Design a protein with these regions (language model features):
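N-terminal targeting/export leaders
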Residues: 1-286
């Protein structure tokens, strides 16, 4: 395990104070190695960027992308700063190309540095600040905007989420509900707090923004969708601003693989999938 050996070397030299001397690490000679699982392709207009926090200030460690099969375009980065002075590492989602040299508000992973390495998680206070292991909830089938009912509509054309137990998100993130069928995912709206209307209310196929009950959901009335005909339901955590109209599948705290017909307003539970969230580590070597 080279990374472990390198991390040990870095920690040994820093403990003896050699890195502060003139014959020690010169800026630009230390390498940061990144090993992260669970990252997804952000599309052509966005990229991942690493940051070392030095005296409270972010210093970029470099930009990389991730392919559809989860492979990073780069995993080793030559540092432009003395890593001994760094306290933590943060991974953000950035526009590409990026007109702003500072980090975006979309902090995905972070970790504190100790002995030249850091474990990275979404739960770190500099990332999302929660591990989402306690996220839970249920949804019902039913019509949230009865004024939009048309001939042939039924409770199977609406999905609503009245009982969601989700933590508050930091700036840079929003929740989004989805139904996923053979033709791909369809949004049910974005929201920041579970007990509020989502961004599109009862949806464009019903009454639109500002209509429906005070919790997230969607009616598919003017273009009816039978949600019991092979659809899944999910809630993702999305970058704000969003990198793509598709689900940010790396952060999907709640999902149900099959919406079943349990009757009008019958509750169906979500499964917690936070264990699949991205995680990893960095190590710094000379």
């Amino acid at each position: 395990d080279m990374s472990h050996t390198d991390a040990m070397t870095a920690s040994t030299s820093s403990e003896s104070g050699e890195m502060m001397n003139s014959d020690a690490t010169t800026i630009g000679s230390a390498t940061l190695s990144l090993s992260i699982s669970g990252l997804t392709n952000l599309g052509a207009a966005f990229a991942y960027e690493g940051w070392l926090i030095v005296d409270g200030q972010p210093i970029s460690t470099g930009i990389f992308t991730v392919s559809d099969d989860g492979m990073a375009s780069a995993t080793e980065f030559v540092l432009s700063v003395d890593p001994v002075t760094a306290s933590s590492f943060v991974l953000t989602v950035e526009p590409s190309p990026d007109p702003d040299p500072t980090p975006s508000a979309v902090h995905l992973l972070a970790g504190d540095l100790a002995d030249g390495s850091a474990q990275l998680s979404v739960a770190h206070a500099a990332a999302l600040g929660q591990d989402f292991a306690g996220a839970s909830g249920a949804y019902i089938l039913g019509i949230g905007y009865p004024a939009g009912l048309q001939t042939g509509n039924s409770y199977r054309n609406g999905i609503w989420m009245p009982s969601l137990n989700l933590p508050q998100l930091p700036s840079g993130w929003a929740y989004e509900g989805w139904v996923i069928g053979a033709d791909g995912p369809i949004t049910t709206g974005r929201f920041t707090a579970p007990g509020t209307q989502d961004s599109d209310g009862s949806g464009s196929a019903a009454g639109g923004p500002g209509t429906g009950p005070n919790f997230p959901g969607q009616d598919f009335l003017s273009q009816p969708i039978d949600l019991t005909s092979g659809y899944a339901a999910a809630i993702t955590i999305e970058p704000e601003p969003d990198n793509s109209p598709a689900p940010f599948s790396a952060l999907k705290p709640l999902a149900d693989a099959m919406i079943e017909d349990v009757g009008d307003h019958g509750a169906q539970g979500f499964v917690n999938e936070a264990a699949s969230f991205p995680s990893g580590r960095i190590s710094i070597s000379n």
